[in-house]
Amino acid sequence: MLSPKKTKFRKQHKGRLKGVCSRGNRIIFGKFAIQALEPAWVTSGQIEAGRRTITRIARRGIKVWIRLFPDKPITKKSADTRMGSGKGDPKFWVAVVKPGRLLYEMGGVPENVARKAAQIVAYKMCMRTRFLKT
């Protein structure tokens, strides 16, 4: 699972998901891509599940580029804790995704294989996605 090696601060504000993606929205590395159409937080587990799905479906010859990184810590308090006494401890990491952001890029396989992989990965993501090709 992906997570930063070191951060300047342990905890972050929640923030808001508004606007569209202005960076990371063009195909650079591969021939095909999966693009987000809605704002969402994508966990490191979801990113890894998508990567494993793509490599499993396409078998040999595929090259996958993960175009997002989970760099936002999400904190949680345990269930039996009373209110107050500060913010909880970081439990997992998410990537903040805005509409238009590329999630994965693929290359080295025919379009029908890449399209099938993208369709199955879309079920594992928490937002609507679409398939792009150059």
UniProtKB/Swiss-Prot annotation:
InterPro entries: Ribosomal_uL16 (IPR047873), Ribosomal_uL16_bact-type (IPR000114), Ribosomal_uL16_CS (IPR020798), Ribosomal_uL16_dom (IPR016180), Ribosomal_uL16_sf (IPR036920). It comes from the Eukaryota. GO terms for cellular component: chloroplast; mitochondrial large ribosomal subunit. GO terms for molecular function: rRNA binding; structural constituent of ribosome. The keyword Ribosomal protein applies. GO terms for biological process: mitochondrial translation. The keyword Translocase does not apply. Gene3D superfamilies: Ribosomal protein L10e/L16. Keywords: Chloroplast, Plastid, Ribonucleoprotein, Ribosomal protein. Coiled coil: none annotated. Transmembrane segments: none annotated. It is found in: Plastid, Chloroplast. Belongs to the universal ribosomal protein uL16 family. Part of the 50S ribosomal subunit. NCBIfam families: rplP_bact. This is Large ribosomal subunit protein uL16c. It comes from Welwitschia mirabilis. The lineage of its organism: Eukaryota, Viridiplantae, Streptophyta, Embryophyta, Tracheophyta.
